[in-house]
Regions:
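Short, glycine-biased loop/turn motifs at secondary-structure junctions and
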Residues: 1-223
Length: 223
């Protein structure tokens, strides 16, 4: 029976998630247990996307993560609120993916124009970055993560899911740590945020769902 480490290495065509594969080795060949035990939210959402969990469910989960962090960071700007509004409208069928994409470009353009002169606090800027990654998930939404989907497109889409969660964890770490924190304090806050996100993701997507998606895609068990 293949192991979870082998599954992640198989899905990780770019070699960017080697540490994740090593960390997952402790779970042996139990995918459901791995889903329950992994404490890094970015890795969880990437794995769910990579094995083929329903793409719109990935987006809904990501949107809820962004919404929760947005409510915690009082300096988060209007550009993030507009992205959330656009994605929620898209989920209701009231906006097109192109309109969501434009809201992301608007947010990105605002950040880029301000550059180093940005009045946004670091945590608010990281939330805005996460919002841009969320719009890319909508823009590049695949009909399904089937074996026929171009590998390049699949890598980008799953990577966007990982990046969005990573930006949110960076935002919370910045928000909860002073400008010049003691050694290790910001990293601790980052890891704590990732653990929190892992819990929230598991509230949306359960381990058996991930296992079934992987089996249907032919990614698990590996031949």
């Amino acid at each position: 029976m293949p192991t979870i480490r082998q599954l992640i290495e198989h899905l990780d065509v770019t070699g960017e998630y080697c540490q994740f594969a090593l960390d997952a080795e402790q779970f042996g060949d139990d995918l459901v247990q791995a889903w329950t035990g992994i404490e890094n939210g970015a890795h969880l959402l990437w794995l769910a996307a990579a094995v083929g969990v329903e793409p719109k469910k990935i987006i809904a989960t990501a949107c809820d993560l962004l919404g929760e962090v947005f409510e915690q960071i009082e300096t988060a700007g209007q550009e993030t609120a507009q992205v959330l509004e656009a994605v929620h409208a898209w989920q209701r069928g009231e906006r097109s993916a192109d309109e969501v994409d434009r809201s992301g470009w608007d947010a990105y353009g605002l950040i880029a124009r301000m550059g180093d002169r940005s009045p946004l606090a670091p945590d608010a800027e990281e939330v805005a970055d996460a919002a841009v990654w969320l719009t890319s998930l909508v823009r590049d939404l695949p009909p399904s993560l089937s074996p026929d989907l171009a590998e390049h497109d699949q890598v980008l889409w799953c990577g966007s899911a990982w990046m969005m969660v990573d930006c949110l964890a960076q935002a919370l770490a910045s928000h909860q740590s002073p400008d010049d924190p003691p050694p290790g304090e910001r990293q601790h806050a980052f890891e704590k945020a990732m653990c929190r996100f892992a819990i929230l993701i598991r509230e949306h997507i359960v381990g058996t769902e991930v296992q079934t998606a992987a089996q249907q895609r032919g990614a698990w068990p590996l031949c």
